[in-house]
């Protein structure tokens, strides 16, 4: 199954106590509260706050609550990584037990399948692009390609060697205007984003906290961020736009949100208030330490 494939690629086959990463939770408390969470999730208490209240009612110490329910992962993440807990299908963000026991496979075999899928759907791309997207070292990706015998094809663009599987669309056409959602796969899918953005524009597309903003591509190049609040569609330019470009972007926005009677407004970065500083205290201690260093 897909669940078994994803879990196998992560390789967390051991119990919670065998491969424990901490989160500030005493080892002696891990399995006890994992059992409580699974029991409550099986009974239909799937929302994070429901599980939190249930654990407090079961006697969880106050200092454990923010650690076990850490917003960056905590015990819930560790349980999901091992197939002990999953999200329900849909957008409700409710936890439940997996419908069936995950089928485990060798980690390299699972990872090779993801490498294959990447070059089938994201190629042409570099080995480094694939590594960044999947979170594997580049040397491991190259080794998986070699050991799995993946028949990668190659093409060179601006002196960069790119790889892909299957056939390329010989009639590919760059759309005049595209609205990309936040965390869009086009942005996440590549380490080198030269395909659609200038290097100096990258800070307008992603920030140091890992947020990927909704952006507008005009004639294949990133030029602005967009935000819809109520009926107002705000376009924040980080590349100077001609009136022709603005008209095309506004028209595309009206088609995209047809029926909502939106008002489109353009502004520049200088028109925005200064961003609030990122609160490092919300990070796990390990990440906070590396950020401060």
Regions found by a protein language model. Give the residues of each.
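Long, low-complexity intrinsically disordered regions
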Residues: 1-187, 191-193, 198-293
């Amino acid at each position: 199954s897909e669940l078994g494939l994803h879990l196998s690629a992560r390789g967390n086959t051991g119990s919670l106590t065998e491969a424990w990463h901490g989160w500030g939770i005493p080892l002696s408390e891990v399995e006890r509260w994992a059992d409580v969470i699974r029991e409550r999730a099986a009974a239909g208490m799937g929302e994070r706050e429901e599980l939190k209240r249930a654990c407090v009612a079961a006697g969880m110490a106050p200092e454990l609550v923010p650690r076990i329910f850490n917003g960056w992962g905590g015990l819930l993440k560790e349980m999901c990584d091992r197939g002990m807990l999953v999200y329900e299908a849909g957008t409700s963000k409710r936890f439940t037990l997996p419908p069936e026991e995950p089928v485990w496979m060798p980690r390299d075999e699972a990872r090779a399948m993801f490498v294959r899928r990447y070059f089938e759907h994201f190629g042409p791309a570099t080995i480094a692009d694939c590594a960044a997207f999947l979170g594997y070292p580049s040397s491991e990706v190259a080794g998986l390609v070699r050991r799995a015998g993946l028949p990668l094809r190659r093409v060179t663009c601006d002196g960069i060697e790119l790889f892909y599987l299957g056939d390329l669309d010989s009639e590919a056409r760059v759309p005049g205007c595209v609205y990309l959602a936040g965390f869009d796969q086009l942005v996440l899918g590549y380490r080198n984003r030269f395909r659609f953005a200038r290097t100096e524009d990258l800070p307008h597309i992603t920030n140091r906290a890992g947020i990927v903003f909704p952006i507008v591509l005009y004639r294949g190049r990133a030029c602005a961020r967009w935000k819809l609040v109520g009926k107002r569609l705000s376009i924040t330019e980080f590349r100077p736009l001609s009136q022709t470009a603005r008209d095309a972007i506004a028209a595309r926005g009206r088609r995209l949100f047809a029926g909502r009677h939106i008002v489109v407004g353009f502004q520049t970065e200088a028109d925005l208030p200064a961003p609030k500083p990122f609160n490092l205290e919300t990070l796990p201690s390990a990440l906070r330490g590396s950020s401060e260093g």
